[in-house]
Amino acid sequence: YLVSCDLGISHGFNYGYGDNASGGNGWWESCANWQAYKCYPNMQFTDGENFEGHLKFHHLNLLHEDWRYQNCFIQDYWCMKHGSDFIGRLWRESKKPEDPVEAYKRLNKLDQAAFCDEQMEGYMRMATWDIDGVRDQAKHRIGQHVSHLHLAASKEGTWEVDSAYCPQNYGYSIINLNTTAPGTIVKAYFKGIAGAKGYRAINIDKAG
């Protein structure tokens, strides 16, 4: 709201996302909670609220409204990657009708593949919270991501992600592994199964 007051309604995500800026906007809730944690950093991983919600919802789309309050951790990675003032720039330099992902890609001159690579790096760092600014506060939370898996009925040794927790676009999933003896070679093979029964099937020609 304040960005829109200062720079006009075509900035600051005061418009909604989607066609002709007709949708909603929960990103400000995410950034508001993130900003609060910059004022009270010792609470980001200890307040018993948003981190627990993050563990529950991180498979959702990055802008999904169901975790608009708990989606307040990716901002730390974005600031590590692009500077401590980046979230402020993202708000000020957004252009209607961009959503935050579209603005992020434009500001950082990223195509779709490069953006996905950056997100992948960020989520890999979240496995151990190896992110500047939160590394010390979060070290006691390493290993607390929950794996929602079940053995596939058709193949021995094959695991599937539960349909309720399949990662949506820009969501993520972390699978905790049992440790083995040092030097042991471990191999895993991943396969996306587009159109599988029990899962949403939209644009399956672009999935899998």
How should these model regions be labeled?
Residues 1-20, 53-58, 112-114, 120-127, ...:
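Proteins with a high burden of low-complexity, intrinsically disordered sequence enriched in S/T/G/P/A and R
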Residues 1-47:
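Zinc-dependent metallopeptidase catalytic helix centered on the HExxH motif
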Residues 97-208:
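Beta/coil-rich, acidic/histidine-enriched accessory regions frequently appended to metallopeptidases
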